[in-house]
Each structure stands twice: as structure tokens, then as C-alpha cells.
Amino acid sequence: MDLAGLLLDEEGTFSLTGFQDFTFLPGHQKLSARIRRRLYYGWDWETDCTLEELSSPVADIAVELLQKAAPSPIRRLQKKYVAHVSREACISPCAMMLALVYIERLRHRNPDYLQHVSSSDLFLISMMVASKYLYDEGEEEEVFNDEWGAAGGVAVPTLNALERGFLSAMDWRLYTDPREIFEVLSWLEGCVAEQQGRRRGWYTYTDLCVLLEQPAWQLVLGSLCQQLAKLSCLLAMAYVSSVALAVASMAVIHQSLGLSCSPPPGPPDLGLASRCLLEPCIPSPMPQCLPSPANASGCLEGNVVLRSLWGSLLVSLTPPPLPPPDPPAPPILLHNCPLCQKLQKDSPTCRACHHLNHTVPTGPPSPWSHSHGLAPPWPWSPMPPLLPQPQQCSLFSIMELARLKSFIFPG
């Protein structure tokens, strides 16, 4: 709010016709409402809540400021004295703010004057000069020196001497730019809001609005907002990182569980094959027709396979490839033995009948007769041999197989 806003009306013009009819200048009511609301003057226009004396918070600020400006212990300023003078001399808030401007000038231009004057005299003379500057002769607010002396308890000659000394220290420069008045008003509003908020322990909405307009508070709140924004960003990054870590952990655990549930690579179960190989051949009646040479040699080869089975289990799982098989042997003439019903060659009389503890194999030696260096009959071997089909076995072969089983599995 500037001086032009106070002098111009709502249409932006100011007419001199009928000037005496104006009770208030344009914008004066807004300024009065601002002072009443922010300087704790009250809102009751009809009772004692007027602008003709200082409010209690403003009086406290004035006492504190003048005691610091004039540290002389003689006639030290008290709040009771400020309230009495402001009530008797009708000190307005604008006169109070103008007096504060004068005291601030003295602090920079003539600090020696403030060291020799008491705080009570400084308050009285600064308020009197500010009132005379604002209210010209002939106005209703005009107060003469004798009235000021009676209000402050000072004789008129002493008051006149104090006035001359004050004007000399000010170098008779009493003009003040309206912007300085509003700067002092803003500073005074901030001091009152901060002091009253600390005294009560809480701040009103008006106090918060006043404090947010102060440059120092704006800087503090700005830095606080920056710190809160940084903290929010850090918390957001930490949250996103934790969520990503949790998702990655769940993926790894799921993958590991999937791999553990899958069957591991390895050799197949040989229980069924071993049981099939260890089972003895069940004798069956001899077919009427003559069997082929391959079927006849199957029963003889079963014993050799059973003996070489346990040795082949100890061989490495990855043996070298099998050598190429031998060429097939020429067919051999076989004869049926009438005594043991067993096929023999060369002679119709079976030598197994005379030698019960020996079994003579027929045909060429089987490649399974040697367990060392041969691949086990497993599906993943390079050239797995075909397992012989169970055929009819002789009585002697069955006896030898039972004897072998009792030797391997005693009891």
C-alpha cells in the first residue's frame, strides 16, 4: 500500500471539490482495518477500542526498543508510563511508527545523543515531534507543549529544551517517505505477531499470515521446504529401491525353487533292470520244434551276464565306447541230448551228464564274459547290447543259478 492508494478514490481520481466533506481519505479505512487486526487494537469502533492510544503489544515493543536505543539508567522507560502518556496525549499508531523512524535515524546519524538522554525523555519528545509533524496547526489532534508536559510529568521549559536538542540531533530533517512508514509497520506487525504467539504458545491465522510476509521467515520456510522436498525424494528412492529389491528376491527364489523341483540329470533307475536280470529262468516244457541257435545260447549266456553284472556296476558311468562287434560265427551243428534235454555239439552224449559241476558253453565266447572294459547295459551307453530274452533253461543251469543266488544273498 502506497501513498497514491491512500489519496486516490476507487475510480483513480482525486477531486478537490468538497474536500471538507471527506471524513477519511480513500484507502484510510483499509489501513485502519489492517492496524486494528494486526496490531491488536480490537474491532469495536463504538467502545474504547480506538486508535487514539497504543495497544498493549505495541506498548511492549516500544518499551523494549527504546530501552535498547537509550541505555541510560536514569528515568528508565516503563510500560505504565507509556500507557499513561499515550492515553493523555492521544498518540496514534501512525505517530508511533513515525517516532520509531526518527529513533532509527538517530541510531545511525547521531548515536552520541542517545547515550546522554534517558529512555523516558526520548519517548516523550519523539512522540511529540512526530505528532506535530503529522497534525498541523488548527487540527483537532493538535496538542500543545504544556499538555505534553502535563502528560509526561515534565515542566514546559524542560520540554522545550528537550525538543530543541532532539531537532538539532535530527538536523531538522523530519520528512519521511511513506515507504519508510510501511516498512516500519511491516516490521512492527512481525514483532507483535511473534511476541504474542510465543506468549500464548500458539499462533492465530493472522499471525501466521504476518510472519509469512517477513523476509526472514520466508527464507527459513523456503529452506525448510527444500529440506522436506529432499527428504521426500530420498524416502521415495528408498521405497522404490526396496520394492525393486523385494521383486528381484522373489524372482530369484521362484527361479531357484523351479530348478530344485525339476528332476536332476543322472543315470536312470536300474532297479527294474537288475531285478529282471537277477530273476531265474523259469523252466518250461521243451517245444517240439528245434529252437534256433540264438535261442539255445540265451540260457547259457544268462549265467555269465549275472556274474558280470555286479562288476559292471563298479565301472565308471562314462566308459569308452564299445569296440566293434566280432563277425558272426558260422552255424554249428547241434544235437539234442536225450538225457538232459540240452543241445550239445560233436556228440549226442552230453558231457554235462558226467560232469555235474561244469557247464560247457556252446558257440563263440560271449562278449559279456569279461566285465572289465565293457560298457554296462544302460540306455545312455554308445552301443547298448540287446538283453537276451528269457528262454527255457536246463535243470543244471537252474541249479547253478540257485547256488549263485545263495552265495550272493546268504540266508
From Swiss-Prot:
Listed InterPro entries: Cyclin_PHO80-like
Main location: membrane
Membrane topology note: Single-pass membrane protein
TM regions (residue ranges): 231-253
Domain of life according to the entry: Eukaryota
GO cellular component: cyclin-dependent protein kinase holoenzyme complex; membrane; nucleus
Subcellular location: Membrane
Keyword rRNA processing among UniProt keywords: no
MF terms (GO), sorted A to Z: cyclin-dependent protein serine/threonine kinase regulator activity; protein kinase binding
One Pfam family linked to the record: Cyclin
Key words, A-Z: Membrane, Transmembrane, Transmembrane helix
Family that this chain belongs to: Belongs to the CNPPD1 family.
Protein name as annotated: Protein CNPPD1
Protein source organism: Bos taurus (Bovine)
